[in-house]
A protein has these predicted regions:
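Ferredoxin-type iron-sulfur electron-transfer modules in oxidoreductases and energy-metabolism complexes
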Residues: 138-158, 176-216
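Iron-sulfur-associated redox domains of electron-transfer enzymes in respiratory
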Residues: 1-160, 168-177
């Protein structure tokens, strides 16, 4: 499938101002704006990366530009959520949707590995659709716990937190310029591990209406 995707990207860079995708370099893999004349063979699909964030930043900086983006199902869900919040301009974005394989869906426990972008102004989906994976068995185990057992479970999980902000930084639908998790009124600076459950509930409640099942 990678060659089919590269072929479409190669076509679109001649029509658009650029296509956002992942590029392989000697230093590793990172998001990149492929443009006319670039080596499209450097385009790769792994590892997963929150492409909606990168796309939003590009669109804000170059408001009149017409971009494309290579996006998985979770990326497209993020793009829709960002659009609702005026962080993505759909009229200036062509989506190249990628259907994940069954193996990829199982790794992420993804229930919807196929991009659902029929309502997007301009898009094309590549790859064979596969059924969604079963939920993580831990979900069923957690549902059978009492409230006290659930509280104890989360205490044990969050005591591992070192306040690295990785949960925030990897979130595909985080776009706030001022983060509540860095506000000393709510989160004491320098305190490790951060207060339970204040730090973690702020993050959870702040994102609760934007969840896209990214499994990050």
């Amino acid at each position: 499938m990678i060659e089919e995707i590269r072929s479409l990207v190669d076509e679109k860079v001649n029509e658009l101002d650029g296509v956002v995708g992942l590029r392989q370099t000697d230093q590793g893999v990172a998001p990149y704006l492929f443009q006319k004349g670039d080596d499209i063979t450097k385009l790769v699909l792994e590892p997963r990366y929150p492409m909606a964030q990168v796309t939003s930043q590009l669109q804000k900086r170059f408001r009149e530009a017409d971009f494309g983006v290579v996006a998985r199902g979770c990326d497209t869900r993020a793009l829709f959520e960002m659009t609702k919040r005026l962080q993505i301009y759909p009229d200036k974005l062509f989506i190249i949707g990628i259907s994940c394989t069954a193996e990829q869906a199982e790794i992420c426990y993804c229930a919807d590995p196929v991009p659902n972008i029929e309502d997007w102004p301009r898009s094309e989906v590549l790859g064979d659709p596969v059924p969604g994976a079963q939920p993580n068995p831990l979900v069923f185990e957690h549902e059978n716990l009492s409230w006290d057992e659930r509280w104890k479970f989360w205490q044990q999980q969050f005591v591992k937190c070192i306040k690295c902000y990785g949960c925030r930084d990897i979130c595909p639908v985080c776009f706030c310029e001022a983060c509540a998790l860095e506000d000393p009124m709510w989160v004491e600076p320098g305190l490790l591990a951060p207060d339970f459950p204040t730090f973690h509930l702020i993050q959870a409640m702040h994102m609760t209406t934007r969840r896209i099942a990214c499994r990050q």
